[in-house]
Amino acid sequence: MIQRHHISSASFMMNLLHDNLYDWTIDIANSYDINPNFVLLSILGEIAGADRGHHHIVNENGQENILGLFVCISAPSGEGKSSAMQIILDIFKEYEKIENENFIQRENKIEAKRLILEAEKQEALDEAIISGDTSRLETIIGELKQSKENKLQPVRIFVNDVTAPAFAKTMESQGYVNLFDPDGVSWNENVYRQIAKYWAGEGHAELRITRQGSCVRNPFVNAVVFTQPEFFRKTIMAETQRAMGITARSILYAAPPYRRRGRGKPIGERTKDELRQKLMNLFNASKPDTQGNTPPTKYLRLGMGAAKILNEFNQEISHEVNLNGNGVRIRDWCVRASQQVLRITGIFH
């Protein structure tokens, strides 16, 4: 079973892509003369990242799967890791700037209100000294305290080179973390512990994420990380990460040597425009309102044909498990594979 379904190359997905995804992947890869699998996996992760947990896909049993991925890609220096991500990260940076312009406007309004309250606080204090009635003063102090507690943080559409405290702070502030790193290294164990916390309920439960007891509803974590082979080996062999379930939830791709053809060309304007429009539409659909409230979750459900294929796959798993002495490990692996298939199906949608 493992041999039959083992994937040594992501190219198997190329035949499954919608025409525009295929065209984007090939155009960007040809432009930089790099492995198209790098581009494909980057696009998958970054479409999921732009959605920010807005969509869930539901299987026939009613189980929800968020569209977040955890992709780790191994390749040596000079293979085009940064180039594979560049065009998409530029779009992410552009949108982050747009959202933060709105953030600055909201912050200016909040600051203006705070200054008014501070002036009213002094008036109320003077009145309380004369009258002995502190009710108005207490109300104003309460509003000031609430304003301070609800202070928003600048939007971080994606992060890289992250530490555990930074990861927690970003999640607490906005409810999601997109980790995109074109040249990552081994992470601190505490980062993995943070990720494991967010995944503990598969993203559908209210999870305690800080020592102060703050909670976030439906946390969304998504990552595409390129790394050197030495760090990749450490990641997949580290028992701590495996015990936490991080490795099992990951899409791991060790790239074979890529033979460059030396025929680079500019990325087509159509590719740039279509990819930008796709990501901007997802960003706008998942954008919080002026009060910081996220839009209601949208649910994707399998059609009859897709459900039939998934059931056939699960039946094949059950059959193979009964024939193989390593059945439990195979079953667990296939459950994770099935979940990844659902997520990728939702992303393709």
Where are these regions (language model features)?
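Phosphate-handling catalytic cores of nucleic-acid transaction enzymes
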Residues: M1-H349
